[in-house]
């Protein structure tokens, strides 16, 4: 019954001191209110209250040793009460005689239940205070060191913060988008002009053709030219079967590889056709020169026409009409592409 009442009071009020004074009232009722016998005095004097101020390990070992001794004395008539007294020895300071060996100068400790109740809060307060002081001290030291170390700049508050990576993006992105749109519009406006201006000037297109055909050796081009002129001089190629490509720009931009040129020349030989005003002019000129019925005179006339007559006629045409220069070059390019 007593234990249940103590438990209930302890649960209802954890700071209640009646639980600690239950043993004291039992001892007072058993031993009497005023006189103590020698046995109780000797037992109370044998308790070493000085060991309570030592470390936790020594205090724990002394408590276990005392618990073992109390178990051995359990058969005595007052051993039960002595074991109960041991749970709260700080309330028995009035029973200790004046001639006892307890000469400690330490103050009387509060009740153990109150210590158990306040220990967590005390430790929490101490830990918070220590951490707060340490954090403040570290912050003060770090601020002092930071002031000494940081560079002298106008934006010292933003030192070490990468705001230029994230914070400024929303301000810069709109301007970048507007610039990109402006660039796209300018490109769209300039591209039709260039596309219109390219077919208008035949000289520019011929320059592009010359730049594309510059990769081939001049000897190969001269051989092709000589072969075509020989065919024209013999009259094996007529200019009436194949239409010209003077207006088709895609025809000039076709890839001109040696294999393609060889294939095209073979097709021309098989079809017996050519397409160029200059070739027709050269054909008529060579026919006018070739009048001899002998093969030797034909060969000599072809050689002379290949080596001397064509450059001479082109020079004469360029000297008479400079505007015909681009047309002649364009016709030569079309003949080579075929």
From Swiss-Prot:
Low complexity composition bias: residue spans: 50-70, 267-306
PTM annotation (Phosphoserine): residues: 119
Domain of life: Eukaryota
Family: Belongs to the ISF1/MBR1 family.
Keyword terms of this UniProt record: Phosphoprotein
Descriptive protein name: Increasing suppression factor 1
InterPro entries cross-referenced by the UniProt entry: Mbr1
Lineage: Eukaryota, Fungi, Dikarya, Ascomycota, Saccharomycotina
Record organism: Saccharomyces cerevisiae (strain RM11-1a) (Baker's yeast)
Keyword Nucleotide-binding: no
Compositionally biased residues, Polar residues: 307-316
Pfam families reported in the protein's UniProt record: MBR1
Region named Disordered: 50-75, 267-318
Disulfide bonds: none
Described function: Could influence the NAM7/UPF1 function, possibly at the level of mRNA turnover. Participates in mitochondrial biogenesis.
């Amino acid at each position: 019954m007593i234990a249940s009442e103590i438990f209930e009071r302890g649960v209802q009020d954890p700071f209640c001191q009646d639980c600690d004074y239950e043993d004291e009232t039992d001892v007072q009722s058993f031993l009497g209110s005023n006189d103590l016998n020698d046995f109780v005095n000797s037992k109370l004097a044998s308790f070493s209250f000085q060991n309570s101020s030592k470390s936790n390990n020594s205090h724990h070992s002394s408590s276990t040793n005392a618990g073992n001794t109390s178990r051995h004395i359990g058969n005595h008539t007052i051993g039960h009460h002595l074991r109960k007294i041991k749970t709260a020895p700080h309330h028995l300071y009035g029973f200790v005689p004046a001639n006892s060996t307890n000469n400690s100068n330490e103050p009387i400790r509060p009740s153990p239940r109150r210590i158990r109740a306040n220990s967590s809060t005390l430790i929490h307060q101490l830990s918070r205070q220590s951490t707060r002081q340490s954090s403040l001290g570290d912050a003060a030291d770090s601020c002092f060191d930071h002031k000494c170390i940081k560079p002298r700049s106008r934006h010292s508050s933003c030192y070490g913060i990468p705001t230029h990576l994230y914070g400024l993006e929303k301000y810069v992105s709109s301007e970048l988008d507007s610039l990109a749109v402006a660039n796209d519009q300018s490109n769209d406006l300039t591209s039709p002009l260039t596309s219109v201006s390219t077919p208008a000037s035949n000289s520019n297109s011929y320059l592009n053709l010359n730049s594309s055909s510059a990769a081939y050796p001049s000897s190969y081009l001269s051989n092709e030219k000589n072969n075509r002129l020989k065919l024209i001089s013999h009259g094996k190629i007529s200019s009436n079967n194949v239409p010209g490509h003077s207006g088709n720009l895609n025809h000039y931009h076709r890839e001109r590889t040696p294999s393609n040129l060889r294939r095209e020349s073979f097709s021309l030989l098989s079809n017996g056709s050519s397409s160029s005003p200059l070739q027709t002019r050269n054909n008529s000129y060579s026919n006018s020169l070739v009048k001899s019925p002998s093969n030797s005179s034909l060969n000599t006339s072809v050689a002379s026409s290949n080596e001397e007559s064509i450059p001479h006629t082109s020079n004469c045409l360029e000297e008479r009409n400079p505007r015909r220069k681009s047309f002649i070059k364009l016709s030569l390019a079309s003949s080579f592409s075929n």
